Regions:
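Alpha-helical transmembrane segments and their immediate juxtamembrane cytosolic regions
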Residues: 3-375
Length: 375
């Protein structure tokens, strides 16, 4: 298999795990009380921690495939940004109009929370003015109804940054890249320093948020890591001997850290996300072994290769669509009395399959114009 085919395997893992990740929301943000609320929260944390590599894997795939950038900058921007912009805009509007649509259909307001448990009570007003207010915010940020769109803002930013970063990546040695990754690795600890030691570090203060290692921080490290690991493999023995223990340690920190913060009498959103933070050492420790192990998969079946190739085409559309189905899929799993510990993966299979079928249908019906809807 060529490297692109191997990265298709990584993409399948990333795509499915991001759907799984959003299927944990009805567990981690379970509305109301339940006799088994402790078990519900446990499984939400257990799966939520396990699935944190989903977004880093996407960014690493981007770095592996696009660094260094070979196209002229304006062509690259036109090709990459326009591909995501129109579907992002269309689906953002659809998600934000959903509460209003439910009101027009005479559906109960609580249904909105079944679909989007993260959204809170404001959306249950089923008001056009509320929906239009959310739509007006699209140029600036996502809303409570389309939380998953945060990644598209990030992705557009990465696309804008890639040709600039690429000029350095193309010229420097592997040793220089490793030095950059070392600097990035130090920044991964900053969220914990801010929480447990001081809100400011290395020149950061109330009038300066750009501290000493600011320019090494963020998702650009995952871009470079994906680029670097594209051509630097570990042996299977090294993955088993080093990678799997590394994953286990990263998972333990993520899981027990999340359980610690959610057990506090009161916690902020920043504290809630602290151990789930994508740019953290524990999540990096989980992500690297998955990326390297997935690259080892050698798919020989032509049918599976075609399926993976189709996922590459449909993947962006699946990401756009899937958030509509994660909540209802969990409700279906509960209605079918699937054991609690299996509800998240079962719901994920349903949400993933339905989303994929919808994207295939849109592409078949709309032909070439489907790119404006599902990428």
């Amino acid at each position: 298999m060529c490297i692109r085919d191997r990265l298709d395997v990584v993409r399948l893992i990333a795509m499915f795990t991001v759907v799984c990740c959003h299927c944990t929301d009805p567990f981690n943000f379970y509305p109301g009380d339940s006799p088994i609320i402790g078990d519900i929260k446990f499984w939400g944390a257990a799966y939520g921690a396990f699935l944190r590599p989903c977004v880093p894997l996407f960014v690493m795939i981007t770095g592996a495939l696009l660094l260094p950038v070979r196209e002229e900058t304006s062509i690259f921007y036109k090709k990459r940004i326009l591909r995501v912009f129109w579907p992002f805009l269309i689906w953002s509007v659809i998600y934000n109009l959903f509460p209003w649509f439910t009101g027009l259909l005479g559906l109960r307001p609580e249904l909105i929370l079944d679909f989007f448990p993260y959204s809170g009570e404001e959306v249950t007003r089923q008001s056009l003015s509320v929906s239009l207010g959310y739509i007006a915010q699209i140029p600036f940020n996502f809303s409570l109804l389309d939380v998953h769109m945060w990644y598209i803002y990030l992705l557009i930013g990465l696309y804008l940054y890639l040709p600039i970063f690429s000029a350095w990546v193309e010229k420097v040695s592997d040793k220089a890249k490793l030095w950059f990754l070392a600097g990035w690795g130090v920044t991964l600890f900053i969220p914990y320093y801010r929480e447990f030691v001081s809100p400011y570090i290395w020149g950061g203060c109330s009038w300066n948020e750009f501290s000493m290692l600011y320019y090494f921080a963020g998702f650009n490290g995952y871009l470079l890591l994906g680029h670097y690991l594209r051509n630097h493999d570990w042996s299977l023995g090294k993955i088993v001997g080093i990678g799997i223990p590394m994953f286990v340690v990263g998972y333990a920190i993520t899981f027990f850290g999340f359980r610690y913060t959610t057990a506090l009498p009161a916690y902020t959103e920043e504290q809630l996300e602290l151990f789930f933070y994508y740019c953290s050492p524990n999540v990096v420790m989980m992500t690297i072994p998955i990326f390297l192990l997935a690259k080892k998969v050698n798919v020989k079946s032509d049918t599976i290769k075609r399926m993976l190739a189709n996922l590459t085409i449909c993947g962006f559309g699946i990401y756009m669509v899937h958030y509509f189905f994660t909540g209802p899929s969990v409700l279906l799993a509960r209605a079918l009395n699937i054991p609690l510990g299996l509800q998240i993966p079962a719901a994920s299979v349903v949400a993933f399959a339905v989303s994929w079928l919808i994207v295939l249908g849109i592409r078949k019906i709309c032909g070439k114009k489907a790119k404006y809807i599902v990428g």
